[in-house]
Amino acid sequence: MGEGFKSALIIALLTSILKNGYLLIDSAEAFHHPSSLEITSQMLTKSVKNNNVQVFLTTHSLELIDFLLEHASKEGIEGRLIYMRRDGENLISSMESFENVREMRETLGIDLRG
């Protein structure tokens, strides 16, 4: 069993334990083969919906963001994405609804990684 699959199972287990709670995931794409990211995002969104868990997640993976947006939409999950970018010496943060982010990605092809 690969590290990415183990990570996905741990996330699914934690969301069931943390029912009605919060889950923080740092570098969610770590140890994942790109092909396992979709499975992980699907497991996460289903588990979040079934267990009413609020997730705070960091990632550098545009693919994971796209998969999460897709599966959240299928599950009827509304969420927010906060992203940061540099403008010279300033760090600028923006918050968008999942719906707006999907539109930004699909229509404009915007890379949210800064």
From Swiss-Prot:
InterPro entries to which the protein is assigned, alphabetical: Bact_Antivir_Def_Nuclease, P-loop_NTPase
Recorded superkingdom: Archaea
Keywords: Plasmid
The protein's name in its UniProt record: Uncharacterized protein MJECL11
Source organism: Methanocaldococcus jannaschii (strain ATCC 43067 / DSM 2661 / JAL-1 / JCM 10045 / NBRC 100440) (Methanococcus jannaschii)
Organismal lineage: Archaea, Methanobacteriati, Methanobacteriota, Methanomada group, Methanococci
